[in-house]
Amino acid sequence: MKNLSKFTIASLILFLFLAPCAQASKPVRIATIGASPLINKNQSPEALVEQMISFWQGQINQVINSKLDLIVLPEICDVPVGLSTSEQKIYVEARKDKLSDFFAKIARENNCYIAFGSLHNTDKGLRNSLILLDRAGKIAGTYHKNFPTIPEMEQGVIPGDQSPIFQCDFGTIGMAICFDLNYDELRAKYAQQQPDIILFSSVYHGGLMQSTWAYSCRSYFVSAIGVVQLPSEVLNPLGEIVASSTNYFNYTLATINLDYELAHLDYNWDKLKKLKAKYRDAVSIHDPGKVGSIMITSEDKAISALQMAKEFDIELLDTYFDRSRMFRKKRLEKAL
């Protein structure tokens, strides 16, 4: 501390003073688009690339005027549907970074993040990846599909083995692709890390597995499904659908607030009543029913959900579960 300048010390004190407030009320505007680029493949690879750019420009035009923070697109959305393995290889070589550059331009011009699924060559081989672009159009993170299907791997796709968490200016993001959703070992990694949002790009929906992932990871869950007949959705950390595409519109928009905490009703009933009585519209206490868990969300720009919970000594969900585990362990030891 002796070697720090007065300016550095003052800055540190200011940061520590403001930090608790920095997390309060964090609305994020999201769009997810479910679409499959069906185009005339009887053309040169270069012409196919131009068709793909035109297709996605039209799709993104549906949502781009909504002042978005994040756009999520489906799995391998930079490759046309219906190509054979050999045709895919020729197309990917001709495409190079043209689709990525196109999405980067959209991100840059509209000051938003974009996550898109890509089949692309890397120094380790062919990858099925979800690529996150930041507001400047630069790559903020890349997730490689951990569990490709057997046919994918037979066609050359190399599995990933990491579950990275990416930091955005609005919060943290984890990712999964299609078949990944079936694997508890991947979900368990994210459940430990608890990102604010999990992005799921896919050509399969996953059904109840989406809710399982959202609740067990304590995360918002945003899916972009590359089959227009299947809904692309936004789920809250309790596993409930809060926004969905429909049979009429292949996209959906949602504003989600990342300043939330989960708690259990046990031991918290009266505390929750007092919390609501004090903060009124500045706090949302949402009960999905049937599970005993609730979500506390701060609508106040100065006070976070965590600060509210601490003020009324509200025990959070995972803390309560851990306390129950320890109590059980002691009872078992006493019984032996």
Which residues does each PLM region occupy?
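Bacterial N-terminal signal peptides
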Residues: 9-19
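Active-site catalytic loop in hydrolytic enzyme cores
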Residues: 121-193, 202, 208, 216
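Bacterial N-terminal signal peptides that target proteins for export
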Residues: 1-10
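Cys-nucleophile CN-hydrolase/nitrilase-fold catalytic domain and related Cys-dependent amidase chemistry
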Residues: 46-135, 205, 212-217
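CN hydrolase (nitrilase-like) catalytic-core segments centered on the catalytic cysteine
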Residues: 95-113, 181-288
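A short C-terminal boundary segment appended to hydrolase-like catalytic domains
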Residues: 259-336
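Acidic/histidine-rich helix-loop elements
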Residues: 36-52, 154
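Bacterial Sec-dependent signal peptides at the C-terminal "C-region" and cleavage site
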Residues: 18-26
